[in-house]
């Protein structure tokens, strides 16, 4: 039933949703309170002040990334997921400088709820013979994304891979010089509730452990999860993260380019605005091709004070032309 339904049984819920959405669109840009100190270049303040971002995980070139205009980039730590082709600290430093000489934030993609077969940690025999040779933490393969396996992320074996020492995934990223991590697979807790009743709490604890370990290694290290916006209801979770990424907010939550259900959008926006109320940014990626849809989506996302980016779902190219003009932020006030 649409949000315009005025039947007596629906009217209170609809009115409440519209009030919440009005609040969501009236909140100030999260960067306002975060950038009061002139010239402050801490990673958290730079992230909060970002007006644009880009997202590419495959087929990237450091020179092309460095030439992009975005205030924040999310990339893989390696060209192919393996150490031999990992970006060097020198390459990361180059990417961190925009063409105009200004500093930008560079986050490394890190999947903490899904194991991927092209990663350095993967053993060729995992998943074979009905999984009898697989570690206990390895779940089933996602039929829609071949080579991606859900994980029991609370298991010591998986957590050791992610944050368990100098050869851990996290430490490789820190040593390469990234400003932070962009955590994917956080929403895996939804599927794991059937195995662990406290799967939600265990995921929050895992994200907190990653943040704590990373900031011991590198003070000010940024932690930005993707999706799982329902976790934002937990104030302690919001306190430990520096922002959030959200896929398919307006379009394509069924992996199409069709508009999402209006009620679902309202619900997600209200959750995401919990973070902007804490003066932390929300980065939205929409996988759209049609210029008219992109422009409409951009205007709507900017009304929410979210930072939009538009690209292909394969994430194997960097689109340009989505960067606002210098005075663009003023248009949103």
Feature names for model-found ranges:
Residues 26-34:
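Signal peptide processing junction and immediate N-terminal pro/mature segment
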Residues 9-10, 28, 103, 145:
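Short, intrinsically disordered low-complexity segments
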Residues 34-333:
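Glycan-processing catalytic domains of CAZymes
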Residues 2-15:
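Bacterial N-terminal signal peptides that target proteins for export
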Residues 15-27:
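Bacterial N-terminal signal peptides
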């Amino acid at each position: 039933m649409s949000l315009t339904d005025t039947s007596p049984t629906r009217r209170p819920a609809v009115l409440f949703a519209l009030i919440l959405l009005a609040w969501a669109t009236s909140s100030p840009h999260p960067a306002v309170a975060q950038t009061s100190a002139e010239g402050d270049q801490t990673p958290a303040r730079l992230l909060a002040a970002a007006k644009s971002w880009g997202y590419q995980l495959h087929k990237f070139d450091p020179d092309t990334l460095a030439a992009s205009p975005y205030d924040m980039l999310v990339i893989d730590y390696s060209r192919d997921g393996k150490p031999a082709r990992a970006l060097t600290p020198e390459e990361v430093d180059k990417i961190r400088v925009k063409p105009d000489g200004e500093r930008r934030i560079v986050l490394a993609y890190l999947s903490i709820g899904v194991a991927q077969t092209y990663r350095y940690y993967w053993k060729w025999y995992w998943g074979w013979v009905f999984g009898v040779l697989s570690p206990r933490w390895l779940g089933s393969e996602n039929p829609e994304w071949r080579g991606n396996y859900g994980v029991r992320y609370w298991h010591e074996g998986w957590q050791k891979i992610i944050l368990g020492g100098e050869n851990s995934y996290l430490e490789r990223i820190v040593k390469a010089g990234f400003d932070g991590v962009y955590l994917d697979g956080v929403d895996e807790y939804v599927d794991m509730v059937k195995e662990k009743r406290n799967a939600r709490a265990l995921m929050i604890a895992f994200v907190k452990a990653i943040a704590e370990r990373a900031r011991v290694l590198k003070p000010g290290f940024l932690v930005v999860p993707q999706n799982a916006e329902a976790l934002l209801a937990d104030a302690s979770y919001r306190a430990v993260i520096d922002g959030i990424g959200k896929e398919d907010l307006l379009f394509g939550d069924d992996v199409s380019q069709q508009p999402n259900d209006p009620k679902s959008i309202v619900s997600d926006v209200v959750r995401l605005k919990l973070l902007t109320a804490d003066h932390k940014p929300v980065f939205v990626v929409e996988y759209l091709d049609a210029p008219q849809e992109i422009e409409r989506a951009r205007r709507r996302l900017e009304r929410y004070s979210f930072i939009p980016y538009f690209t292909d779902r394969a994430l194997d190219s960097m689109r340009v032309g989505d960067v606002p003009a210098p005075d663009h932020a003023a248009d949103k006030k």
